[in-house]
Amino acid sequence: VSRDVVRSEHIGRQLPLFVGIGVVALAASVCAVRAAEPAAARGKALFEARCASCHGAGLAGGEFGPPLSGPSFAEHWRGQPPEALASFISSRMPPSAAGTLPPADAAALQAYILHADQAADGALAEKASAPGSAPAQAAATPPPAPGPARVEIRDPGLAEAKAGRLAPLAKLSPVTDAMLRRPADGDWLMWRRTYQTLGFSPLRQIDKTNVKALGSAWSWSLPASQNEITPLVHDGVMFVQSGDAVQALGAAKGDLLWQYVRALPETGSEARSTRVKTMAIYGDRLYAAFVDGHVVALDVKTGKPAWDHALLADADATNRGRADGVSYHLDGGPIIARGKVILGVSLGTDTPKGGCFIVALDARDGSEVWRFHTIAQPGEPGGDSWNGAPANERYGAGVWTPGSYDPDLNLVYFGTGNTYDVANLLEPRGGKVGPNDALYTDSTLALDADTGKLAWRFQHVHRDVWDLDWVFEQSLVDLNIGGKPRKLVVTGGKIALFDALDRATGKYAFSRDMGLQNLVLGVDPKTGEKRLNPALEPEAGKPKFMCPSPLGARNWPATAIDPASGILYVPMVEFCTNYSYSPRSPEQTAAGGVDISFSGMLPRPGNDGKFSRLTAMDLKTGKVIWTRRQRAPLASAMLATAGGIVFTGDRDRYFRALDQATGKVLWETRLDAAPSSFPVTFSSGGEQYVAVTTG
């Protein structure tokens, strides 16, 4: 677990480094005892004097603190002992002087919170009375009134300073469908900037001649998470999601404008270990997915929730995004298409109830529009491709990368992962092994954005039992191939072999192999069918040497493509592994899990001590333009710009600008932590910035 820092660099006078510590939000607990009215009245006065400036009067949430009422807050503390609330407040609040609040004051604040809940909907009392909790007691007298909706600032200087700091919010314009189709040059409105997911910006103020003057503009500490963060920028406001928090920052200075902190159950540490790659912005709302399986729409100017939708209705919120004991993840994040919020779901190695899925929600109210399951079910097209395994023994096909979208075709494109427990594909059923391609694992899926109907699918590798997903970015690029214009979707799996498909029909066009794998020996030039290395077929108890390792020659750090030149920039690592197949009992196989194991990461044969490479390849011809190799593995996605630069970061904490034409290092800086994220570039106040999240 790390504490992420978002940093912004720009050309011009080197500004002093601004370091801000993210606000630690107050969270209270559900207690089963309701205090007497006098204590609640005293707690109300204390709250308004000492807490409301962050949490807002009336417990509704403020600019710097989460709400202390409502069902989400109640779920956060369901089943806690009666003394938990006062103990937490006394020991943890206020963040700037934790432990200084007298126990009597903490008890009074607890009483106020519980009484105020009674006046609302009793969510705290209802949750406190859940199984395993002590029963709530009836209050003897009505609770005090919750107070005004906002805290009034009476100091003229403070009010003026606050108004100036919040000024960027007033300039925010609603994001339209037209903006999403063609974003303003200075904005970064979605994961890889545009629907095409190219990771390319038309900004050129920072170019090869002046990038050496790039200097620090500001930095800002974020709540702890595992990074893979993409900041979004619109009209000079940056939106960042880290762990259980969403923050709006002034893009030019890094000032905190508002934050939303989602109250999550305390079980486990998933809020800090989750990897949500992006949010989405549309109209006057920001759409964020959280580890508890909820998608939330937030007002872009205030951070106030507009709606909150649970993707799995039977999810047990006390178990952090688990349904029927099965974990699920929203690691990709949403994309907007024709008023719908569309995202994929991954459910881990013990996939339940039809498997992973892609879902579309109505952006207006969060209601579900459609759902597409990525594991073909018995009786459906592709349902006979699982070696006769029943539906509840089909695993994988996770969707943990955001999709892309072609507005002209109204198709969204998603990649899927491999299966996990492979014995159900390899072992005979009824005396023989049946068809076992395992659809729709390792596939590109093209879905109608309005209905979720499958338009076409292409499986890149059949029956992947080596954990070599094809789940990554689906890049939409127009290329001239053999004198003919082609509208293609290009994607590469962990083996760093890239397939190009016609994005209207899914017809195979060509493949480009980066040369770091030994699984695929050849590709049919007409169909794209892969001829796999028979020496790597699983044999029980027999280790086999395979390249790449299960972490892949490439993984989640996304590629970039210059749409004008058709040059693809690919970050890769050079590792191999020994893998073993260990079949388990039929009962264990049916229950899910894994039966392929790996020895870890091993150097490639003949390795010279360099374990990472960045390659620029002409997609039209397959010609490698240049390759830059180094010892430290690359850590960030690629960011290419019209200034002739490609930005990249590595595990050795360096963030670099390279010449797109040659791979030469033009500028570099060493950060406080590895930039394991998706760099973006934007403009504000007439200046171009580059932002990257570290940690």
Language-model-derived ranges and their functions:
Residues 188-192, 224-245, 270-295, 325-358, ...:
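Repeat-blade elements of multi-bladed beta-propeller folds
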Residues 31-46, 97, 175:
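Electrostatic cytochrome c docking/interface patches
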Residues 48, 96-195:
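Flexible coil segments in periplasmic/lumen-exposed cytochrome c-class electron-transfer proteins
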Residues 298, 355-367, 432-433, 437-451, ...:
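Beta-propeller blade signature
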Residues 38-61, 105:
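Sequence/structural segment immediately N-terminal to covalent heme-attachment motifs in c-type
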Residues 251-253, 300-302, 363-365, 449-451, ...:
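Short loop/turn segments that connect beta-strands within beta-propeller blades
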Residues 219-232, 259-280, 308-333, 373-402, ...:
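Extracytoplasmic beta-rich repeat domains
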Residues 44, 57-90, 94:
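Gly/Gly-Pro-rich "capping" loops immediately C-terminal to redox-active cysteine motifs
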